[in-house]
Amino acid sequence: MARYTGPVTRKSRRLGVDLVGGSSAYEKRPYPPGQHGRARIKESEYRQQLQEKQKARFTYGVMEKQFRRYYAEAVRSSGKTGEQLLQILESRLDNVVYRAGLARTRRMARQLVSHGHFTVNNVKVDVPSYRVSQYDIIDIKPKSLNTLPFEVARETAGERPIPGWLQVVGERQRILVHQLPERAQIDVPLAEQLIVEFYSK
């Protein structure tokens, strides 16, 4: 399945979650699109589970096949499957760049990673789905530091809270991964148990 490249605000309204991050268009009309968008629809259990899975997929920009792999890995892990799945999604490099405030959206973070602006433990990484580990050190490449995206990130530092499992240090905007996130540190409005139920059928 190809990555979704359509109108993100419309998809946000369809799924009932802001996929952009601070989208004024979504805030004005947080109900489903269409002539009867405001109408209440009694949702089946399956529909609720499917919608929650889609919310997770589109929030993190993950295709179905990859999402299934993440779920299978979460099942094999110790701990609650839903929480393990969210931890896997949060530990993607593109998400870490977004969480650290170096990109306004996850889409932008994915693009910055793909363009080769980052190193992890002094090794260039240009794969957005790369998974960080505890104690990893993520740096912006020196030649990229003074490019517009990172100048803007420095100017807007502090506008969005950085989760406690990450730290951004100094003018070089080095990201330190102190730990992988616990469920309480993940503020995405997802009911992960519904995703577990969807795949358990």
Curated annotation (Swiss-Prot):
- The reply to whether rRNA-binding figures as a keyword in the UniProt entry is yes
Q: Which InterPro entries match?
A: Ribosomal_uS4, Ribosomal_uS4_bac-type, Ribosomal_uS4_CS, Ribosomal_uS4_N, S4_RNA-bd, S4_RNA-bd_sf
GO terms for biological process, alphabetical: ribosomal small subunit biogenesis; translation
Q: Which domain of life is it from?
A: Bacteria
SUPFAM superfamilies membership: Alpha-L RNA-binding motif
> Which molecular function term from Gene Ontology is one that the record holds?
rRNA binding
Protein family (similarity comment)? Belongs to the universal ribosomal protein uS4 family.
Descriptive protein name = Small ribosomal subunit protein uS4
Q: Which organism is it from?
A: Mycobacteroides abscessus (strain ATCC 19977 / DSM 44196 / CCUG 20993 / CIP 104536 / JCM 13569 / NCTC 13031 / TMC 1543 / L948)
